[in-house]
Structures are given as C-alpha cells and as structure tokens.
Amino acid sequence: MDKQKINEIEINGTVYVPKNSAIEMAESSDGLKPVLIRSYAAGVHFGYLKSEEFTAAGKVVTLLKSRRIWYWDGAASLSQMAVEGVNKPENCKFSMPVNVNEIVNVIETIPLTKVAFENLLKVAIWKQ
C-alpha cells in the first residue's frame, strides 16, 4: 500500500498543518527585521526596519535598503505578498534600492517571511 503524504487536515472546520511547515520569518540584518510597509501617500515599500516614530504627521518609518513597489502581480493582497511573495515577478515594477528611506504617514507595517523576502529581492529592478 502506498503511503500518502498529508499536508493538512481539517477538524470541525479548523485546518491544521504539520509543525515543521510553520511560517519562518525572514532573518534580521544587523538586528533589523525585513518589513513591508504601506503609507498614505508614498505607496508600498519593503526593506529593513530601522525605526518607527509616532509624530503629529503620523507614523514615520525609516527603512534601510528600501525598494518601492510601484506595481505588483501574483499576490492578491499585501498580506499574501508578505507571507508568500509574488508568483508573477516578471510583471512587477519594483524600484532600485535606496540606502535609507524615511516614509511619513505609514498606515501598515507587516513583517516579511523568509520565503517572501527572498522572493521580493529577486524581482528585477524597474527603470525607465
């Protein structure tokens, strides 16, 4: 009899997965964690979170090695992108990285998984 590999099981409406398939967060660089942020006016960016400060102008985030996500394809939401990355990188438009980027009025900060961060770093630089 062939053995079946079970990746998930549902019991009373709750889906369970093997312990070893838990989400692994991306590694820090110099103690800084990789994040995906969404701001009110400056769009979506990802990079290493250097600082967060709450000011009268809103939350100000400083990212290191930051890239702006001008357009993405292959993820239904930023939540999916932060967990899985994008599955159509050839259609994405990500800027070249900048060493330091201070972004004002950040409304969402999402930690990146290891899989997502490695995936996003591989998206080609979009320039005109």
Which ranges hold each PLM region?
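Conserved RNA-binding domains used in RNP assembly and mRNA/RNA metabolism
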Residues: 5-11, 17-128
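Nucleic-acid-binding small beta-barrel platforms of the OB/S1 family
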Residues: 1-2
